[in-house]
Amino acid sequence: RHKGDEHARLVDFEMNSICAAGTGSFLDQQARRIGVSIENEFGEMSLQSVNPPRIAGRCSVFAKSDMIHLQQIATPLHDIVAGLCFALARNFRSNIARSKEIKTPILFSGGVAANSGMVRAFKETLHVDDKEFIISPYHASMGAIGAIYYTKNNHLIKNPFSGTEMLEKHLLSDINYFVTLLNL
């Protein structure tokens, strides 16, 4: 935040470009491989872990290999799942954030933000609390919303999208829906 400004501003942005191990699709693949629903069980299962094992996070092949080894030595599944969450959080810290100072508040967006195991892993890895780690109720659609604004503001389409005003009104409304349909 700038002094005297009520709005937070984006200071920096990075995405993982090294390996698929830092992506939501990798979590999905591993959840399917071990027979756990990513939507209903994965995150909650990982919260049961007290001492997550160390799993390689830089490379999806090494991470999968570590998980298979842990299964072979009868490591509880909730510990393996938590270990994977922490591996991805450490991967973010070391490869994406690198040596940069991570300033708060931190906005966690994308579909992975719905995973309570990943939320826990990020908070613990980055040493932040609930006030410093924000998850928007629109976390899964923030990329699409940003694409709409980018396209409109840069005049990239011949027939400009006219729904941004309705979108802004909807997003800024005080009404809280569990699941909403947005008609644009």
Q: How does the language model describe each region?
A:
Residues 9-47, 140, 149-153:
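Glycine-rich phosphate-binding loop plus the immediately following alpha-helix
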Residues 65-94:
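Adenine-nucleotide phosphate-binding core of ATP-dependent small-molecule kinases
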